[in-house]
């Protein structure tokens, strides 16, 4: 299900030179021939170190029902990934922009391309962040079907034991030592 925000939201396309090359409506950018565009991923932790995993809503057009990192999104034109992270935390998880602390960039150069079972492609330059949330979350059911807080070591074990249950971008992100170490810290 699309929301009014997703109908008007723009994603920033990336040209062959690796620089911004225009925009495209988010509602129609993801197809079988998705252009390369900017995004971000974020892993949220609580002060006790537990990591939030979310299961994508079943109505999502790509990877419905798949478990993944805490949240993802697309910076809009002129928006920094950090500002987009705070915006999406509110839209997706009901976290006030001030409710996130210590947002830090873990994988600045992460990118991936993946095709879901319906043939829709994700092709993103997608820096990966971690941030701390101290308060409660109130996930938007149009975005998140289920969620679970887990110790970082349990997250890594679950992905290793059942990789098919998790999003391809999360699996690829966890191939990076810097992220694995951050989740275990």
Give, region by region, the residue ranges found by the protein language model.
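Conserved Nudix-box catalytic region and its N-terminal flanking loop in Nudix hydrolases
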Residues: 2-3, 29-39, 50-95
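A short coil-to-beta-strand element that immediately follows conserved catalytic motifs
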Residues: 96-107
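Short helix-to-loop capping/linker segments positioned immediately adjacent to catalytic or ligand/cofactor-binding
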Residues: 18, 92-96, 113-118
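Acidic, metal-coordinating catalytic segment for phosphate/diphosphate chemistry
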Residues: 2-41, 45-47
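Nudix hydrolase/Nudix homology domain
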Residues: 65, 77, 109-185
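A structural signal for short, well-ordered beta-strand segments
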Residues: 42, 70-71, 127-129
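Short, charged/polar surface micro-motifs in flexible loops or helix N-caps
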Residues: 45-51, 58-61, 111, 135-136
């Amino acid at each position: 299900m699309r929301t009014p925000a997703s109908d008007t939201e723009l994603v920033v396309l990336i040209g062959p030179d690796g620089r911004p090359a225009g925009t495209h409506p988010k509602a129609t950018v993801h197809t079988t021939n998705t252009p390369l565009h900017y995004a971000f991923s974020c892993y949220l932790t609580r002060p006790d170190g537990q990591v939030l995993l979310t299961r994508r809503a079943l109505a999502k057009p790509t990877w419905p029902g798949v478990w993944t990192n805490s949240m993802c999104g697309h910076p809009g034109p002129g928006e920094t990934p950090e500002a987009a992270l705070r915006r999406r935390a509110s839209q997706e998880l009901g976290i006030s922009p001030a409710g996130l602390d210590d947002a830090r960039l873990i994988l600045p150069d992460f990118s991936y391309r993946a095709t879901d079972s319906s043939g829709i492609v994700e092709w993103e330059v997608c820096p990966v962040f971690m941030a701390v949330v101290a308060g409660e979350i109130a996930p938007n059911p149009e975005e998140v079907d289920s969620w679970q807080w887990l110790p970082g070591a349990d997250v890594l074990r679950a992905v290793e034991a059942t990789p098919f249950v998790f999003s391809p971008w999360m699996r690829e992100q966890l191939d990076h030592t810097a992220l694995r170490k951050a989740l275990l810290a």
